[in-house]
Amino acid sequence: MSLLNNRSFRATVLGHLVVDLLNAERPLILAVLSVPLGLSNTLIGLVSLLHTISGSLLQPVFGWMADRIGPRRLVAGGILWMAATFGLAVISPGYLALVLLIVGGIGSAAFHPAGAMEATRSARSHLEQQETTAASLFFLLGQIGFILAPAIGGPLLERWGTPGLLALLPLALPVGLLAGRDLSSLPGAQPLEPATPTPHPGRRVLTFAFLAFVLVTAIQSWAQTNMVTYLPKYYSDLGYRPGVYGLLAATFMVGTAVGGMTGGWLGDRISRRSIVSLSLLAAGVPLALYPALGATAWGYPLAFVSGGLTGACYSILIVHGQRLLPGRAGASSGLILGFTFAAGSLGTLVSGVQADRFGFDAVFVTTAGLCVLGGLLALATRIE
């Protein structure tokens, strides 16, 4: 049976599209509000951090719940919560809008571990154990949401301001109801194939390999979240209109989607560790070129290539993280996704301080260096 013909999987990936469509409007909203509210880059990073923490700290809890009650209520409830808080945020005045954007992260926290659990569970049933491919399809729809968000949201913001984003809400309600109808209510606690062990490894080797994996995951998330959060602000500071920097942000997310799908497909066929290492090493090149070429016509290909290379290893890292905790699909999904979201936002806060003090060129160079470091560290992991 084709995975895409599975009603539960279809509802899950459509839900991911809607959740990340709303999530990805946040950087555009913050860029628009930065002038009337006087938001610094540090404060923008702090809002993004608080939004992520409000969700990431809860993801293991929601994952634990998914293992016991199934994904249906968590996925559907997460979508509808996101829609409600987003709708209130775009019509609320002043700092209340920021508070509502932060609280909306709870809906994302409920959705992501349950959705990722359902995606990989569907792969074990319908895609001959190709979990990385299934995870990449799940994350592909999320990336499509990130692509559509600036492409649609930029013109809406330019024409009607933040209230114009209410036009996105009619997409969320039917998808939330569809998830409530079609998703499984079966508990998610079940054995997962563990990460491939190495015969008789020393404790020190295992500890270093695990720490290397943690650092690689944090670096990948930091690099990608930096670009998602600050690319609109970078071009806004250069004087570009919302419609233009929305298109540039969408170009980055198109690259991320293409890279993520390609990396996931390759991850079921060749060495996953090599994909992670090579993609991050290569990502340092376009990121390092941003200070010289970002404000030219080369900004579009740089956005696409940097998105593709930073996103190529994402589903591989998530699936490997799930396998480190076999037996609890929901809890393991919540832990690894919560960690990636939190690590990315903490890094983004640091980069916001750096941008305020030294400018965005310094942020791009630092992000490039982090990717190179992550690519080298990946060689020490046991991702296979």
Segments from the language model and where they lie:
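Structural signature of the two symmetry-related core transmembrane helices
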Residues: 73-87, 274-289, 368
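Residue-level signature of mid-helix packing/kink "hotspots" within the transmembrane helices
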Residues: 24, 52-60, 146-147, 253-261, ...
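C-terminal transmembrane helical hairpin of 12-TM major facilitator-type secondary transporters
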Residues: 270-317
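Helix-loop-helix hairpin linking two adjacent transmembrane segments in secondary transporters
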Residues: 94, 137-184
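Extracytoplasmic gate region of multi-pass secondary transporters
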Residues: 26-27, 208-250, 257
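Conserved MFS/SLC helix-loop-helix module at the cytosolic interface between two early adjacent transmembrane helices
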Residues: 57-94, 270
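Cytoplasmic helix-loop-helix junction between adjacent transmembrane helices
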Residues: 100-140
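Helix-to-loop junctions at the C-terminal end of transmembrane segments
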Residues: 58-70, 157, 259-271, 355-356
